[in-house]
A protein has these predicted regions:
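A feature for loop-to-transmembrane-helix boundaries and adjacent hydrophobic helices
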Residues: 1-242
Length: 242
């Protein structure tokens, strides 16, 4: 809700219809959940091939943020085309709010004691100067042994907060249209690539190839490529404030 209200204020300021984002969310949220589940099932197909009915049991866990983002972005693109609104304009407006949602959402991993990293010492966690109530809850069972683990949820949450501040600063620069959105993709993907390397519950493509890291690299290359293309080849004059 906080992320929506934050985006809604900017959307109205930038000339979008007052009900535009609400209508978009009606479609984007369900599609994000569905695609997040599909992404997870594809990566974990061996767990579902014998019992396909388990695919619909989302309440048992098993969704992936990259799948959710892909589903949401594709839905938003189609929605914007139907409404005759620039997708990149909407993406620029909502990018900071996506980081707000992701930053808050990672605390769900803390509550569920999931998506954590590998083993570390308590002394290491104390050296990070994080509250004891977080440290105490990072004492979990890992491979049958109780140990302290990396609070990867916190790393990503803080990374997203920093990214939020950067994107809000970039708004004032009045970059070319789409560059705030592409900046979001680059920033989030860099953080996710390195944080993913610490996690113990990664989805794998093959062998030791973590899917989130592969997707992050592809996303960075795509975003950088789009910035270069729009600036130097397409030479667009559209700006964030247009």
């Amino acid at each position: 809700m906080l992320a929506y209200l934050f985006a809604q204020r900017e959307a109205v300021k930038r000339g979008l219809p007052e009900d535009f984002l609400a209508d978009l969310l009606i479609w984007a949220v369900p599609m994000a959940i569905i695609s997040a589940r599909i992404y997870y099932v594809i990566m974990k197909w061996e767990n579902y091939s014998d019992n396909p009915i388990d695919i619909i049991k989302v309440w048992e866990g098993g969704i992936a943020i990259h799948g959710a983002l892909i589903g949401a972005f594709v839905t938003a693109y189609i929605f914007c085309r139907i409404k005759g609104v620039s997708f990149l304009k909407v993406a620029d407006i909502t990018a900071p709010s996506i980081l707000i949602g992701q930053s808050i959402g990672r605390w769900g991993n803390f509550v569920n004691q999931e998506a954590h990293g590998g083993p570390v010492s308590r002394e290491f966690l104390e050296s990070l100067m994080i509250p004891n109530w977080i440290i105490d809850n990072m004492y979990v069972q890992l491979n049958g042994v109780m140990t302290y683990v990396h609070p990867t949820f916190l790393y990503e949450s803080l990374w997203n907060v920093i990214g939020l501040v950067i994107l809000l600063m970039l708004r004032k620069v009045n970059l070319k249209r789409g560059e705030i959105f592409f900046g979001y993709i680059i920033w989030y993907s860099i953080g996710r690539f390195f944080i993913e390397g610490l996690r113990t519950d990664s989805l794998y493509l093959i062998a030791e190839l973590r899917s989130a890291q592969v997707v992050s690299i592809i996303a960075i290359v795509f975003a950088v490529g789009m910035i270069i293309y729009r600036r130097f080849i397409q030479k667009t004059n559209e700006r964030y404030t247009d």
